[in-house]
């Protein structure tokens, strides 16, 4: 399959920035913090923590990609709908990192659970709340395929826990929203209020997203917090309904990421009247407020979008059928982020992984091998042992680039 990528490029339309940053109010029952694990080597905050001292009901919607990050895999195994904390890292997606990525995340979970348990034991009440690793959720965003820097992150957890703050002023929210960014130009924050019965409830939300934004979400993370008392089953139903007309209705570059996550947490600190049914009229105002907040964040993501000319040949082999090979090939070729990497002479093969995963075809991550030129860059669900980024970077400067994707599932090719 041969494609001239210059046919795909259009001048980037400059969009005006949205208005001033919205001031978020504190959510009772939530503590937040962010610190630098020096993942960017520039001292910026790159890990953040959201802690619920008394726990929180939660609901989440994840990527539709068939290749998912270790953090998404972890969260999907959590069967409880009541959690104690969410930890987020940027710079590294922890995707296509193999068993090491999963093990690294587990080590982080153990360290975090111990640190939070210690914090709990130091309260004035003296009560010790044992926080298990199954009480924790994780989110990662960044480059696909790079070794997960779990030791760097793990070493900063005590400081991250120490810096947890109950009072979230606008500077704390801004700092934390900035800590989850990757290629974003600016942090994204939104706030709404509504009533459930006669009780006023608050909803605060932050998001990141700039590249890989498409219907069905994409490198997009959004975390929403409310002090309302709403059971997880109703949070899930409302969230799915709201996402359908907000986050899943935007597109920047048509790519679905491996790390997408939108989650809502309810601390229950406002003692609104009990909700027994999803059709309860008392939920209508909350749903409308959540929709306004989500649409606000989704629009901020669109405004913050990313940006790329060469002759590229993509061969897909080892597929189960011709149509599967063709679909995967075009999924990669039509990916604007893949084209951006080509035009920018960037050896970011993780974008090929992303495009394979979002094709919708049946694949087995452990069997995929990716070659760029004569260089094997990925195989067995991880970066290739012989991978040499400097040699690949030189190859990316060529005017003609060849890519081979071997699915190792069948005999069809395209």
What are these regions (language model features)?
Residues 120-127:
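Short, low-complexity intrinsically disordered segments enriched in small and basic residues
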Residues 2-107, 111-119, 131-414:
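A structural signal for small-residue-enriched, beta-sheet-centric alpha/beta enzyme cores
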């Amino acid at each position: 399959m041969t494609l001239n990528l210059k046919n795909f490029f259009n001048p980037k339309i400059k969009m005006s920035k949205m208005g001033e940053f919205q001031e978020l109010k504190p959510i009772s029952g939530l503590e937040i913090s962010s610190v630098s694990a020096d993942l960017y080597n520039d001292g910026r905050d790159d890990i953040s923590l959201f802690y619920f001292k008394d726990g929180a009901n939660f609901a989440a919607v994840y990527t539709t990609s068939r290749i998912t990050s270790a953090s998404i895999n972890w969260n999907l195994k959590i069967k409880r709908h009541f959690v104690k904390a969410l930890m987020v890292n940027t710079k590294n997606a922890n995707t296509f990192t193999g068993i090491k990525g999963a093990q690294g995340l587990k080590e982080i979970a153990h360290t975090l659970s111990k640190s939070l348990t210690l914090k709990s034991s130091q309260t004035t009440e003296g009560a010790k709340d044992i926080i298990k690793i199954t009480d924790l959720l994780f989110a990662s965003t960044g480059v696909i395929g790079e070794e997960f820097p779990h030791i760097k992150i793990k070493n900063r957890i005590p400081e991250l826990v120490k810096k947890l703050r109950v009072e979230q002023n606008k500077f704390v929210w801004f700092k934390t929203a900035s800590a989850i960014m990757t290629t974003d130009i600016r942090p994204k924050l939104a706030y709404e209020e509504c009533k459930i019965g006669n009780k006023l409830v608050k909803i605060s939300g932050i998001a990141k997203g700039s590249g890989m934004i498409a219907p069905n979400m994409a490198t997009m993370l959004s975390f929403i917090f409310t002090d309302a008392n709403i059971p997880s089953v109703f949070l899930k139903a409302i969230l799915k309904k709201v996402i359908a007309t907000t986050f899943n209705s935007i597109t920047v570059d048509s790519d679905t990421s491996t790390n997408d996550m939108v989650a809502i947490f309810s601390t229950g600190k406002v003692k609104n009247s009990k909700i027994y049914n999803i059709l309860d009229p008392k939920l209508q105002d909350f749903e409308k407020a959540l929709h306004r907040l989500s649409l606000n964040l989704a629009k901020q993501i669109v405004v913050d979008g990313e940006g790329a000319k060469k002759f590229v040949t993509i061969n897909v082999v080892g597929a189960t059928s011709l149509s599967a090979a063709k679909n995967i090939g075009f999924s990669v070729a039509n990916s604007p982020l893949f084209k951006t990497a080509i035009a920018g002479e960037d050896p970011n093969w993780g974008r090929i992984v992303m495009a394979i995963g979002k094709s919708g075809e049946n694949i087995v991550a452990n069997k995929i091998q990716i070659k760029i030129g004569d260089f094997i860059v990925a195989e067995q669900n991880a970066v290739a042992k012989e991978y040499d980024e400097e040699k690949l970077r030189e190859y990316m400067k060529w005017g003609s680039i060849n890519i081979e994707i071997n699915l190792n599932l069948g005999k069809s090719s395209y």
